[in-house]
Amino acid sequence: MSFSREEDKKLKFKTSKKLKISPTFESMNLKDDLLRGIYGYGFEAPSAIQSRAITQIISGTDVIAQAQSGTGKTATFTIGMLQAIDLKRKDLQALVLSPTRELASQINQVVSNLGDYMNVQSYAMTGGKTMKDDLNRMQKNGCQVVSGTPGRVLDMFKRHLLNTRNVQMLILDEADELLGESLGFKQQIYDIFTKLPAACQVVVVSATMSKDILEVTKKFMSDPVKILVKRDEISLEGIKQYYVNVEKEDWKFDTLCDLYDSLTITQCVIFCNTKKKVDWLSAKLTQSNFAVVSMHGDMKQEDRNKVMSDFRSGHSRVLISTDVWARGIDVQQVSLVINYDIPEIMENYIHRIGRSGRFGRKGVAINFITSSDLSKMKEIEKYYRIKISPVPADLSTIS
C-alpha cells in the first residue's frame, strides 16, 4: 500500500486533551490475530489519525475523530472495534452506521479483512435485499458486527429482529452526512441510539466536522475525546486542483470530450449534482463512443453492485456519479476527479476530490465552472484556505 508518510506527518491536530501517540501497532497492545490481519492488509505503521485515535477507542471513551480522506479512518475505528469485542460471544456487540449502501458494504469488507485471523462474524445490513436474507445469514453464523445504513438497521430494531442488549459500541462514519439536515438521517440516528444500552460507547468519524455537527453530538455523547484536524490542514496535499472556466453550461460537454482526448487516465470519477444529469451525461458520452459507467441512488442494488465491481476491478475506467459515491468509497487506481457540477454542499467538495490521491497517492481534481459558479468556487477556496488554479494550456503537465 503506497502511503506518503511525509505528508501524513505534516498534519496538525487539535485535541480536547493530551494524547499518547502510538508510533507502531505493536505499541497499542493489540491481539496477535488482529496484528496479523493489520499487516496482512498491507499496513506497516499507523497513520497520524490511527496513532492518536485507536487507543482512545480501545479505552472505551467516546471519541470524535476527524482526518483527511484516504488516511485510514475506516481502519482506525475498525481496529479499535475488533480489539474491543469479545470473540467468545457470538451476539451483536458493535454497530457501524454510514450514509450509503456501498460504503456500508465496503466497511464490512474492511472488518472481514482486518479480522481475517480472528474469525469475526460481520454483516452488511443495507436496503436492496430482503430482511429474510439478513436474518438467515445472521442466525446461521452469528453476528458480532453489523455495518449498515440507518434506515435498514432502524427497521430491524423496530421489528425486534436485532438484539441490541449487548451492543457496546456505536460508530457513525461520515458523521457530518448522518447528522446533517440534508439527507434526513439525523432522526433515525437518534431513534437508533435510544434502543442501545445506556453504557454504549459512541465513536464519530468524518473528514469534515462543522461546529453544528459537533453541537449535535452533545445529545448522545459523554465527554468525548476530540481529535480534529486544524482547518488549514484539511485540503488534500497530494491532489492538484484546477478549474476550467466554461462560461456556459452548454459548453461543459465539449470541454469534457477535449479533456478525455488529452489526458492519460488510469481511472476517473465524474461528479454531477443530479441523477438526471448523471443519466444524461452517461448517455451522451456513450453516444460519442466513450466507455463509461454510471451510478446513483435510484438504481437497483444489483446494478449498483455490478457498477462498483467493474470499476474496482478496472473493467471500467470512467464512472459518472452523484454524491452517493463521494463518501468514503476507496478505489485506489482513481487518479482524476472531474466536478462536472460544483457541489451544492460545500463539505462535499473535499469528499469528492478525496476520491483521487487515496492514501497519499498523487491525484488531480478539475472543476468545470460557469460564470454563475465563480462565487461558489471563491467560497470553497476561502473555506478550505486553498487556491484552485486555471487548467494550464499544456495538459500533459497536470497528470
Swiss-Prot record:
One family name in Pfam for this protein: Helicase_C
Swiss-Prot/TrEMBL GO biological process terms: maturation of SSU-rRNA from tricistronic rRNA transcript (SSU-rRNA, 5.8S rRNA, LSU-rRNA)
Disulfide bonding pattern of the chain: none
Subcellular location: Nucleus, Nucleolus
One term of GO molecular function: RNA helicase activity
Residues holding ATP: A67, Q68, S69, G70, T71, G72, K73, T74
The organism's place on the tree of life at top rank: Eukaryota
Entry keywords, A to Z: ATP-binding, Helicase, Hydrolase, Nucleotide-binding, Nucleus, Ribosome biogenesis, RNA-binding, rRNA processing
Every Helicase C-terminal domain range: 238-399
Domain called Helicase ATP-binding: residue spans: 54-227
Short sequence motif named DEAD box, residue ranges: 173-176
E.C. number(s) listed in UniProt: 3.6.4.13
CDD domains, per the entry: SF2_C_DEAD
Top EC class for this record: hydrolase
A single GO cellular-component term on record: nucleolus
Positions in coiled-coil regions: none
Catalytic activity: ATP + H2O = ADP + phosphate + H(+)
Motif interval(s): Q motif: 23-51
Annotated function: ATP-dependent RNA helicase involved in 40S ribosomal subunit biogenesis. Required for the processing and cleavage of 35S pre-rRNA at sites A0, A1, and A2, leading to mature 18S rRNA.
Recorded family membership: Belongs to the DEAD box helicase family. DDX48/FAL1 subfamily.
Domains as described in the record: The Q motif is unique to and characteristic of the DEAD box family of RNA helicases and controls ATP binding and hydrolysis.
Name of the featured protein: ATP-dependent RNA helicase FAL1
